Swiss-Prot record:
Disulfide bonds: none annotated. It comes from Streptococcus pyogenes serotype M18 (strain MGAS8232). One of its GO terms (molecular function) is ATP binding. Its EC number is 2.7.1.33. Belongs to the prokaryotic pantothenate kinase family. The keyword Transmembrane does not apply. GO terms for biological process: coenzyme A biosynthetic process. HAMAP family: Pantothen_kinase_1. Pathway: Cofactor biosynthesis; coenzyme A biosynthesis; CoA from (R)-pantothenate: step 1/5. InterPro entries: P-loop_NTPase (IPR027417), PanK (IPR004566), PRK/URK (IPR006083). This is Pantothenate kinase. GO terms for cellular component: cytoplasm. It is an enzyme of class 2 (transferase).
């Protein structure tokens, strides 16, 4: 961490876990296992030490959002309208964004039992493969130019205004957008938006996605650790793909282990590391909270914007 984070307060895990006094995790070990991504590692103790204090912090921000909305409505002499509380979660490929997002969705559902808590990933706003091929962008998939940012911003605008919104659905099994399939959202109380690009902005857009966020999280780790996690995840995906000839990764499933590792390492260095260093990591100081992971996936440091 550098002077880039002068506006953040660094909090150790030991200090952070004292910010929530309850010892009950609100979910079972089986539930935790079911939402943990391939090769990620999270324990009930992590839920208690890290995520329960985080739920408390989100509640602080939600109350502040509601109070501000109420006061603005009075000032403008307009009817009071409760808007969805939107949480953005960003970080590198293979850093554990999906696990964090699903865990927060579950915990928010448990702590706000009468609330609708939804989750959307920005993968659905990638351009379809055919379009990327036609534009010569398939090898840039995941980079800023491969996303339909206008559609994504329109989606967030509809959500923020309490309107029904629809998001395309992406499948990692086919490595593409699923044709004619949409995920619908009808004015949820909470919306979690997860993706590598949630703090980014293309040059031709005046809006940032983060303009719509009420709270935001960046999952951080040393790039050498993320590389290891990426390769481990790739090998796990290949094991699963052996059982499904229609899976996109089935074409790599018969590679000898050494070749599979070499292939994954090359993809990491030529695609994912470049994307991380040029476009993802430089946006992390836009987050309200940074969760830093050590080599064993455990969150060891927390950075909260002052």
């Amino acid at each position: 961490m550098s002077n880039e984070f002068i506006n953040f307060e660094k909090i150790s895990r030991e200090s952070w876990k004292t910010l929530h006094q309850k010892a009950k995790a609100l979910l079972t070990q089986e539930e935790l296992k079911s939402i943990t991504s391939l090769n990620d590692n999270i324990s009930i103790n992590d839920v208690i030490d890290i995520y329960l204090p985080l739920i408390n912090l989100i509640q602080v921000y939600k109350i502040a959002q509601e109070n501000l909305s109420f006061s603005k409505s009075l000032f403008l002499k307009k009817d009071i309208q409760l808007r969805p509380f939107i949480i953005g979660i960003s970080g590198s490929v293979a850093v554990g964004k999906s696990t964090t997002s699903r865990l927060l969705q579950l915990l928010l559902s448990r702590t706000h039992s009468n609330s609708q808590v939804e989750l959307v990933t920005t993968d659905g706003f990638l351009y379809p493969n055919q379009f990327l091929i036609e534009q010569g962008l398939l090898n840039r998939k995941g980079f800023p130019e491969s996303y339909n940012m206008e559609l994504l911003l329109d989606f967030l605008d509809s959500i923020k205004n309490g309107q029904t919104a629809f998001a395309p659905v992406y499948s990692h099994d086919i490595y593409d957008i699923i044709p004619n399939q949409k995920q619908s959202f009808n004015n949820p109380d909470f919306l979690i938006v997860e993706g590598i690009n949630v703090f980014q902005n293309q040059q031709n857009n005046r809006l940032y996605m983060s303009d719509y966020f009420d709270f935001s999280i960046y999952i951080d780790a040393d790039s050498s650790h993320i590389e290891t996690w990426y390769i481990e995840r790739f090998l796990s995906i290949l094991k699963l793909a052996k059982r499904d000839p229609h899976n996109y990764y089935a074409q790599y499933a018969q590679l000898p282990r050494s070749e599979a590792i070499a292939f994954a390492r090359n993809v990491w260095k030529t695609v994912n590391l470049e994307n991380l260093e040029k476009f993802i990591e430089p946006t992390r100081n836009r987050a309200e909270l940074i969760l830093h992971k050590s080599a064993d996936h455990k969150i060891d440091e927390i950075y909260l914007k002052k």
